[in-house]
From Swiss-Prot:
Occurrences of domain CBM20 (ranges): 599-704
One Pfam family it belongs to: Alpha-amylase
Gene: cgt
PROSITE patterns per the UniProt record, alphabetical: CBM20
Full protein name: Cyclomaltodextrin glucanotransferase
Site description Transition state stabilizer, residues in chain: 350
Taxonomic lineage from the root: Bacteria, Bacillati, Bacillota, Bacilli, Bacillales
Cofactor note: Binds 2 calcium ions per subunit.
Signal peptide: 1-29
């Protein structure tokens, strides 16, 4: 159906009234699609700080601050408070279709020596029990039911990197990092005969390796190469998947091995596929190729710190401009295989609030408009719509100040969240810069024949916009924001040229057309990794109501369900590797391919491979390559590494934790690569190893 604003010029009044009364305000969010969030808007909630719906479960004593004057302590927010704000329409009217809640598991009860508490949910004690200050399992079930019945998905935070604060020399420090399995002590930090934890001191963040195998600050760091810990954490997340969660945000992914996390994702996707994204913090202007590699290879998306930091630099302090922002958009589309699955934001619990005291809220409004019309999965931090202020932790975690539905930002979010549900260009479309200078950025998102054109002026003077071209068809277009940010109408000519117009100072306009696509067009595939038999969901347009077929390259997959906009299939029994997916409708019309789905050899386990006496010259690194897809299929360009040699083992012994197929007879060798790409192979026979069905292992061999 064409954009209503284009039709207004020609429809008789009586017919127009009928259409307005019949038209839904937004497409209903599909809570059954747990792997595609590209058209959703996530609302991040620090559970303890949002709303106290049940005072009877509040803490007592030293860990509780009743008036929340001590932001390091519990303040009383709980799941009932979230339920209440769903039921009274605050979140649904805002257009929220997913909530990201604090880790729901039981956390430590002890007061940290510095006066801190576990209100934030990141100091886990027992992953198979709830945090009683948020609620019990029946409360959690009610939260899930309430959210789902209102078209809202639920994402949980998850911390498989560490338990809680601990000191090796002081068992009385907090709770000594103790971790429990449904009430039964597994172990603690200072008495660790089963080696559940790393005991390598704290990281100085000097290298990727150092940040993985040493403690993050004073947090007891799990040894994820320990089979007990590996199985406990994987069992625990399955418990919450069985409780109905729709997504997972994984904390501190930079501080765990990619190999173990890939095995975790394989486990999740085999059990209950849900959208999963991790936190890999990047500072302002920081670009990390390892970050891109992780997002492309681990099976997990990431919080898009490049997006978040750049938009803050443009609109908070002016240290960057729209040229820098556009460059970031272009480069990340190249660097991330699935850029539309990266989770975008303007602020969160680990950085200062976007709004700050004694400043205009206008740039917050502009930032929200850009966030909600850009590629990626947009996330709103609780209270941003109320212009909450605050510096770094804990000031950025103040209690929710108000639930006012009349703020400008609330209206902007509500309007654009609805547009995101209705127009697939915002979820699936590519980004094209159409007009730019330091103050002005006009960009277009398109998918099939659906188009959204957004114009932003962050400067203090208006601009005359000449020579703007667009993919919008001929017609007049009104501002979808309805002048919330001083937008205007535009006229598009038959050749795509837009008539000259004035773009207001600190103004934003959004123009759009929504067109159904007649032939099949894939917008999203999720997850993008899986073994034979796993379920994969394909969303897009023009698939038709009658069942067609889905191809992985030229191999047919079993169709589990089919509709015009969503298909579920089973990964076919094909050789492990990367495949391009296409949809063929019942009329034999075939879609363009959706590239690089990875078929795994089978279930995955994380194994530490190590090699002694591998001496190298400066600038040369060690890699591993072998006989399965997960080891590069003997292709040195796809070898795994570079390997490590500083913490768990020291040079000339090298090691790396790698996700490999379970119960598989592996053959492999180590190779040396210099900075020019020259390769030196090991001599002798291939190393051999049969992987276990579950758990972890370490394999140590000598260089040949």
């Amino acid at each position: 159906m064409k954009n209503l604003t284009v039709l207004l010029k020609t429809i008789p009044l009586a017919l127009l009234l009928f259409i307005l009364l019949s038209l839904p305000t937004a497409a209903q969010a599909d809570v059954t699609n747990k792997v595609n969030y590209t058209r959703d808007v996530i609302y991040q909630i620090v559970t303890d700080r949002f709303s106290d719906g049940d005072p009877s479960n509040n803490p007592t004593g030293a860990i509780y601050s009743q008036d929340c004057s001590d932001l390091h302590k519990y303040c009383g927010g709980d799941w009932q408070g979230i339920i209440d704000k769903i039921n009274d329409g605050y979140l649904t009217d805002l257009g929220i279709t997913a909530i990201w809640i604090s880790q729901p598991v039981e956390n430590v009860y002890a007061l940290h020596p510095s006066g801190y508490t576990s209100y934030h949910g990141y100091w886990a004690r027992d992953y198979k029990r709830t945090n009683p200050f948020y609620g019990d399992f029946s409360d959690f079930d009610r939260l899930m039911d309430t959210a789902h019945s209102n078209g809202i998905k639920v994402i949980m935070d998850f911390t498989p990197n560490h338990s809680s604060p601990a000191l090796e020399t002081d068992p009385s420090y907090a709770e000594n990092g103790a971790v429990y399995n449904d009430g039964v002590l597994i172990g603690n930090y200072s008495n660790d005969p089963n080696n559940l934890f790393h005991h390598n001191g704290g990281t100085d963040f000097s290298s990727y390796e150092d940040s993985i195998y040493r403690n993050l600050y004073d947090l007891a760091d799990y040894d994820l190469n320990n089979t007990v810990m590996d199985q406990y954490l994987k069992e625990s997340i399955k418990l919450w998947l069985d409780k109905g969660i729709d997504g997972i945000r994984v904390d501190a992914v930079k501080h765990m091995s990619e190999g173990w996390q890939t095995s975790l994702m394989s486990d999740i996707y085999a059990h209950e596929p849900v959208f999963t994204f991790g936190e890999w913090f990047l500072g302002s202007g920081e670009v990390d190729p390892q970050n891109h590699h992780f997002a492309n290879e681990s099976g997990m998306s990431l919080l898009d710190f490049q997006f978040g930091q750049t938009i803050r630099d443009v609109l908070m302090d002016g240290s960057s401009n729209w040229y820098d922002f556009n460059e970031m958009i272009a480069s990340t589309e190249e660097d991330y295989d699935e850029v539309i699955d990266q989770v975008t934001f303007i602020d969160n619990h680990d950085m200062s609030r976007f709004s700050f005291e004694q400043s205009s809220n206008r740039h917050t409004d502009i930032a929200l408009a850009v966030l909600l019309t850009s590629r990626g999965v947009p996330t709103i931090y609780y209270g941003t719509e109320q212009y909450l202020t605050g510096g770094n932790d804990p000031e950025n975690r103040k209690p929710m100040s108000d639930f006012d539905r009349t703020t400008n930002s609330y209206q902007i979010i509500s309007t654009l969240a609805s547009l995101r549900q209705n127009n697939p260009a915002l979820g699936y479309g590519n980004t094209s810069e159409r007009w730019i200078n330091s103050d002005v950025y006009i960009y277009e998102r398109s998918f099939g024949d659906s188009v959204v054109l957004t114009a932003v002026n962050s400067g203090d003077t208006s601009y005359t916009i000449n020579n703007l071209n667009t993919s919008l068809p001929q017609g007049q277009y009104t501002d979808e924001l309805q002048q919330l940010l001083d937008g205007n109408e535009i006229t598009v000519n038959s050749n795509g040229a837009v008539d000259s117009f004035q773009l207001s100072a600190n103004g934003v306009s959004v123009w759009q057309i929504t067109e159904e696509h007649a032939s099949p067009l894939i917008g999203h595939v999720g997850p993008m990794m899986g073994k034979h038999g796993n379920t994969v969901t394909i969303t897009g347009e023009g698939f038709g109501d009658n069942e067609g077929s889905v191809l992985f390259d030229s191999d047919f997959s079993d169709v589990l369900s089919w509709s015009d906009t969503k298909i579920e299939v089973s990964v076919p029994d094909v050789t492990a590797g990367h495949y391009d997916i296409s949809v063929v409708n019942a009329g034999d019309s075939q879609s363009p391919t959706y590239d690089k789905f990875e078929v795994l050899t089978g279930d995955q386990v994380s194994i530490r491979f190590a090699v002694n006496n591998a001496t190298t010259s400066l600038g040369t690194n060690l890699y591993m390559v072998g006989n399965v897809n997960e080891l590069g299929n003997w292709d040195p360009d796809q070898a795994i590494g570079p390997m490590f040699n500083q913490v768990m083992y020291q040079y000339p012994t090298w090691y790396y934790d790698i996700s490999v197929p379970a119960e598989e007879n592996l053959e492999y060798k180590f190779i040396k690569k210099d900075s020019s790409g020259n390769v030196v192979w090991e001599s002798g026979n291939n190393h051999t190893y049969t992987t276990p069905a579950t758990g972890t292992d370490t394999v140590l061999v000598d260089w040949q």
